[in-house]
Each structure stands twice: as C-alpha cells, then as structure tokens.
Amino acid sequence: MKMIILVVSLHVLRNSAAVRVLCMFPTPSYSHQTVFDVYVNALLRRGHSLVVISPKIHNHNHGHRHHRHENLTEIDVGSVTNNFFKRLLQDSKVSRKRGIVSDSSTVTRVNYLGLARMISAQFEHEQVKRLLRSNQTFDVIVIEAFVSYPLILSYFFKDTPVIQISSGHGTAENFETMGAVARHPVYYPNMWRDRFKGLSVWQTVRQVFTEIRLYMEFSQLDADQSAMMKRQFGSKVPDVDALRKNVHMMFVNTHPVFDTNRPVPSNVQYLGGIHIDPAVTSVADEIDNDLAEFLENSTMGVVYVSLGSSVRASDMDSNMLNVFVETFRSIPYRVLWKVDKSDKIFDNIPSNVLIQRWFPQRRVLKHRNVKVFITQGGVQSTDEAIDAGVPMFGVPIMGDQFYNVYMYETYGIGRGVDTLTVDARQLTEIVMDVADNEKYKNGTLWLRDAIMDQPMRPLEKAVWYTEHVARRKGAKKHLGTRAANVTYSKYAMFDLILPMLITIFSTYLQKILSI
C-alpha cells in the first residue's frame, strides 16, 4: 500500500512540474530538423507536453525522426512546405558558381523572402489555423531562430515567453534581439560572409561594405515580413521589431569557441553538439557488414567525403567534379564518398573509391582507420568530426560554412580551401597534409577535450533552461540586458554625443572666425 502511495505521489509531482510547450521549426532541412528532434525528444522524456509544427523530414536511411509519444501533438506542414522548398533550391541554382557554391553575393533579401513566403503558407495549414483560433495556453513557445516569421505565434499566445533555438550559428539579428555584441567586421563577423583571412586593406574595406549590405538586406527583409504578417493576420499585428521583444531566451547550437567567445547576456546559452549527446540513440548510427569490412581492410587509411544533404555531385560543373575524381585517384588512401544514387553515372571513378547515397557518418568517423573528413563545413558535421577526433578539410559551399572552415584553421583542426578556385593539385596537397601531419589530429583532440570540459552537457542545458523559463514565466527580467532590441543610434548615445559635438564644433568655429 505504501509503495502504491509513493508511486502515485511521484506521478503527481512529475506532472505538476510538467509544462506545455509550443514549437515551430519550419525549415525542411535534415540538418536543421535533426537538432530540433533531439531537443523535442529530450523534453518528452522529462514528461512535458508538446505541440510541434514542422515539416516531416525523411532521410535516406530512415523515416521521420520524432518518436511517437502520448504527450506529443505533431502538425505536419510538409504538404505546403516540401515542394515550395524544392522550388526555392531549384531557383537558387541559377546564381551558384561551379554548380554548387553560393557565396555571400547570393545572400539577398529577395532570396530569403521566398523562405518567409513558405512559412506564411505553413500558417495557412488547416490544423495550424485551428490551433491559432483555439483557447489553448502554453508555458513556453520555442521557435527556430533562423527566420523571423514564426515570431507571430507570440501575438496569438500573448504573455507566453519565447525561446529561439538555432540549429547552428545565431544571426546578427538574433544577437541584436538579445542585446549581445552583434556586428563587428573583424572580431564578430557576420556569419554570411565568405572572406575572413589574409585580407589586404582594400579587401578589408570591401568586407566592411559587405557587412553594411547584409545589414540593409535583412532590415528590408524584416520590413517585408512585417507587411506580410499584416496582410495575412490583420493590421493590428505588431511588426517584427516589436515581436522580438517577446523573446526571453536564445539557444545557439555552436560551441562558444566557434563564435570567438562572443560577449552575450545570460539569456543566450551556447549548446554545441546537442545531437551527439550520449542519451541520443538512432538507427542512423548502424553500420552494415560490407561497410565494416571496407573500413577494416583499409589499413593505409580512409578519407571520408560528404558535402552535406543538400549538395548533389550532379550539380557540380564538369571541372569541379573532375577535381574531386582526380584527387581521389592520386592519393594512397581509400575513399568513402557520399553521393546520391540519382546522380550522374561516374564511369571513371577510381577503384579506391566506394560510393553510396548515405553513410552512418558518426560511426564512420569514429573508426580508427579514418584519417581525414572532407566536409562542406556544416555545424553538425563539424561537431561530429571533433567528437570523433578526426581532422577536417573544409570545402565550403554556402551560408556559415565559410566561417566554420575559417575556424578550422584558426584552431588548427584542419585546413580549408577557396572552393571557387581549387584545383586537383591543391586539393591533393591539402588532403595529404591533413592526413599525414599529426598537428591537425592533435589539435582536434585538444579542442574536443577542451569544449567537453563543461559542468553540464548541451542537451541537459537546453532542457534545464527551457524549464527555467517556464518556472519563472520568462527570463528577460533577471537574465537579460537593457541593451536588447535597442537601436544602434540609441546604443551609441547619438542623442547625447551629437549635440555635444555640434556644440564643440560651433564653439571652435566661432573662435576661429573671431581671430
């Protein structure tokens, strides 16, 4: 009888601490959704109740990653998302260089406006519309930080604190929202840039202008999204800048060292490697016998090559594709190359190369014979390589990958290349250097041990702070900063400094004229 009472008491206590969480993760990208899936499942294991709006993502190995749970209500907006996103990707091919490279020149308001329209369409999904009309209440709203449109949820569920979570780096706009140091062309560069090192004075000036252009592009994008929200939901809807004031916490899924240890207030929490937590298990980590045999028999070493889930070898121009093929032909190692089966037939693939549409990446990287990881520089791939102690050769293609690869060289964990100009000779030289030079391996192991020396694992931190925001009904008051959402003119105290300068100049000018 006492045991029954104890069990019932524990059940009541657990449910009394449970919170209701509304999540919206709109980007139909496997690398994004992998992070959010791990976070959602961790909250479910804690007994919390979640409503999740997202497009279901299927990868090559297994289906949708969310585990069915009685406390989970999923609203799958894939029917209004996936084809839309495919068209966006198809349209973006026009501006790509060498068939696959999207540098900072492609980061424009027009290109990202399509993403906002896609999310606007998600809000027209019938189940989402019913949710917005309902009288449901939530303790916390958690939304993807990459885009601003989901902030509209804070208008419908008023007085509910918002947490933004990024699958990788935070944007400059995210940091402005939190009152953190957001823009500095040298120390805290915009993650959308593609040039960071070895710059001449003139090149540095050009990068400053790139920073200014990006600021103007995304400011206009915010204005466009504000107008879209008012057309969709009515003229009383606040603009994006006002909705950002409802954000109480931000999770950034990178290690602070990869953000140059940016000064941030306490309501910005860096995670980094959330999806490689020991509590996370997945069928994606399984390895078949043929692959195991290939790895075991590769006594000279293995080079693992994956340019991410959104890059297809068939999109490369013939010159770029030949650079990879000739490099693999000339190195003494065996190669695992992740290439989609629907890609063009490679009649001249060297005999030392094994091609598959998918590999269990974490297991492959942890094999003792893997010497180098040739990667596009994505955040999740970088985390997995560091966790496995494998040095990297970065071939950046888009977004924050240029910055991530720059950090490889900064911390001595690998090397990078200019994807627009690289040839087979240079690619071969760098592969051999990273494979043979122990300093890259040692640098990776050192960095891994340093970033893992923390009082709390990333996933535990994300869950704890989510519960903290729910318990305290927000976090801005005690963890935030007064600098949050402040304009640059106010932050720099122009209203005080400009009159002072004018007064000083006028006084000086009067003295000059009176002489």
Curated annotation (Swiss-Prot):
Single Gene Ontology MF annotation: UDP-glycosyltransferase activity
One Pfam assignment: UDPGT
Coiled coil residues, start to end: none
Alphabetized UniProt keyword annotations: Glycosyltransferase, Signal, Transferase
Source organism superkingdom: Viruses
E.C. no: 2.4.1.-
Signal peptide from the UniProt entry: 1-31
InterPro entries according to UniProt: Ecdysteroid_UDP-Glc_Trfase (IPR016224), UDP-glycosyltransferase (IPR050271), UDP_glucos_trans (IPR002213), UDP_glycos_trans_CS (IPR035595)
Similarity comment text for this entry: Belongs to the UDP-glycosyltransferase family.
Role of this protein: Catalyzes the transfer of glucose from UDP-glucose to ecdysteroids which are insect molting hormones. Expression of egt interferes with normal insect development and block molting.
Protein name per the record: Ecdysteroid UDP-glucosyltransferase
Originating species: Spodoptera littoralis nuclear polyhedrosis virus (SlNPV)
Gene (UniProt): EGT
